[in-house]
Amino acid sequence: MSSEVAARRDAKKLVRSPSGLRMVPEHRAYGSPFGLEEPPWVPDKECPRCMQCDTKFDFLTRKHHCRRCGKCFCDKCCGQKVALRRMCFVDPVRQCAGCAPVSRREADFYDRQLKLLLSGATFLVTFENSEKPDTMVCRLSSNQRFLLLDGDGDGDGHREVEVARIAAVQMLTEGLPPGDTLSHTSLPASRPAAEGGNARAIGMTLQYTTPGAEGLTQLTLTAGEDADGSRRQATAWLAAMHKAAKLLYESRDQ
């Protein structure tokens, strides 16, 4: 991909919506796969009362729409302004008591885990037709749309997996039976293995579609056994990718 094409795909623009200022991709098709669309607002005529506490709206009690769910509430039930990066808002926006905690938890992904994914980690990567694994660095592209795998020159060299084409993710753990399987219709209730409990993430299997090919392609990432910090970095990257997969499926289910 030429630098000119890449720049055009990564271009962004500032837009003003009823909810606030948003920095969105110039071309909608090139948006982050983790993003959410703005919800339609419940029409004013359909909500004469707060949808949380049932207080009637009047001249003194104004109605406000939650920017995340689009429902209308009184100021007491929708007075928190919280960052909502999945909708590309520039500033914190008004959210209801139910949505605000969700957005705060997602902020941890953008503040901590996304940085891990962008930095990358070293894995033993096994492709479905490979006889032996290749040592490769796996990282998320800056536009969040691709997983980039770069080898040491002895194997396939460079591979790209489009995040939006990932169909299933299976976490490989040690300390408990085989890990959770994520799919478009089934999400695990457990936390990522590296974030708590006795299990520890040691790898991940990805299944994804490839343009022009039938069925699913599969690859497996496994953290190496070396004693230095690269294994720790790899397990942290796996936990971050586990969270990213959950956000990906939520975006699809919107």
From Swiss-Prot:
Principal subcellular localization: other
SMART domains: FYVE
ZnF FYVE-type span: 44-104
Location(s) in or outside the cell: Cell junction, Focal adhesion; Cytoplasmic vesicle; Endosome
Amino acids binding Zn(2+) 1: C50, C53, C74, C77
Record remark: domains: The FYVE-type zinc finger mediates interaction with PTK2/FAK1, and also interaction with PI(3)P and association with endosomes. The C-terminal region exhibits a structure similar to canonical PH domains, but lacks a positively charged interface to bind phosphatidylinositol phosphate.
Assembly and oligomerization: Interacts with PTK2/FAK1.
Function: Plays a role in cell adhesion, and thereby in cell motility which requires repeated formation and disassembly of focal adhesions. Regulates microtubule-induced PTK2/FAK1 dephosphorylation, an event important for focal adhesion disassembly, as well as integrin beta-1/ITGB1 cell surface expression.
Name the UniProt record assigns to this protein: Zinc finger FYVE domain-containing protein 21
Source organism of this protein record: Bos taurus (Bovine)
Gene for this chain: ZFYVE21
